[in-house]
Amino acid sequence: MSEPRSMAANAAITALSQVASMALGAVIALVILLRFGKDAETDGLFAAYGVYGVLVVVAQSFRTTIVARLAEDRSTFAALDRYLGAVGVLFAAAAIPLLVLAEPLARLLTADLGREAVDAARTSLMILWFAAGAQLAGALLAAALAVRDEFALPGAAYVAGGVVSIIALIALAPVLGIQAVALGLCIGGAATVALMLLRLLRLGYRPSAVGMVPDRTAVGRAALLVWAAAGTLSTQVAFVVTLGFAAQLGEGAPTLYTYATFLFGLFLASTAGAMTIVLAPRLAETWDGRSESLHAPLLEVFRAGLTLIAPIVGVIAVAGPAVASLVLDSDDARVLTDTVLAMSGGLVLAVAMPVPLVALYTRGRYAAVAAVGLQGVVLQFGLSAIAVGFDSLVALGFASLLTGLAGAIVLLLLTFGRGAWRVLALLGREVLLVAAVGALAFVPALWLGVLGGRALQPVMALGGLVAFVALARWLLPRHWELAQRVAGPALGRLRRWRSAPAGAGPGA
């Protein structure tokens, strides 16, 4: 048996798979935009997708919050059976909003957008119930594989599921219209589950029907799954709340806000999301429980994350309008870019959160994280109500940023106590350093892009990226080294996959 990979290698593999999976999601979004445009039907679809996303967030949280519960059991596979039974309970409960209450929920989500939007949302909710079941089961299987130090196969399975979803969407769109999106997600989710289940079977897992049958304790485990996800769940609930306010800005606004949030999620998953998934099993097994021992990993994760995030934000600022205008009109392209930039500060907050979140989950402080999440939903509702008065999606983006800032501060206080202020000072220093280097690289590129017009902006963005790499290597050698430790194994893995003989795969 090979030695366990380093955290950096596993983070890189996970980041690579998450980026690939999210990129496939971007392809789906692009197909929707090109095939169906930006109208009441797409608003209804994305309203339903927001609710489905709540269940996806619950599912994905299993990969960090439930790993410790699976790892501490004498038999990971027996524990997996029990939690699959709990997933069955959750799936049945999800039928209430997605099936039974589909019509009233669709009316609530689409505000005054009309009957066409309501019908699209209602039908999508019903179909996405099945896709949600696949997501719940798949994430639990991925958590079980993480306990075995298996990260490449789950990543590849999610990517394969995305490819299947795209193929199904393109094939079914002429027949089913906008509902081909929801059905495509169902088919892709089933493919993801099948691939991970096959890998577990190869590792010796034998599903036990008796072990999966929900009993009196299954309801308690289902509640634990939701409770453990409450902290991260709040982010998606806040998105659904904000989407409702976006609907008040008129037809097409929810679709644009969804695209902005999707881009934000793409960058988030490839940085903070990947690090959190990989940190969970390692920290659960090795952490000594002292807050002081978290300082070093927190700083390393934060430095690596900032070094990856800065060029992302810079490229969006310089080339975003030009790229977005390829599929949107110039006004919508500007709004989309500005909204993403308004949200982008949340990426900085997010790369500070993996270590505190995993530490709190390892301590079993699910209630505290849930309380922070609830605070975020309430705050987001209030800030969105104010922001919508400005008649601007960008204002809604800033509202999301302020909500994230408040939540991040509270989580640091919960993790480090009075030492949180020292931690904040250290993190603030790192932000200033990386921001200064980013400004040196991208501000000239931004001005040259403005002067040269949109045709020149992508070239200037590339120039800014090259300048950032050169400056970071010179002025921030430690940050650059950490970023390389994260990205290097991913590039090496890519080369090995490309050179692998036919029939070999990521899980081989």
Each predicted region: which residue ranges?
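Alpha-helical transmembrane segments of multi-pass membrane proteins
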Residues: 100, 113-141, 167, 318, ...
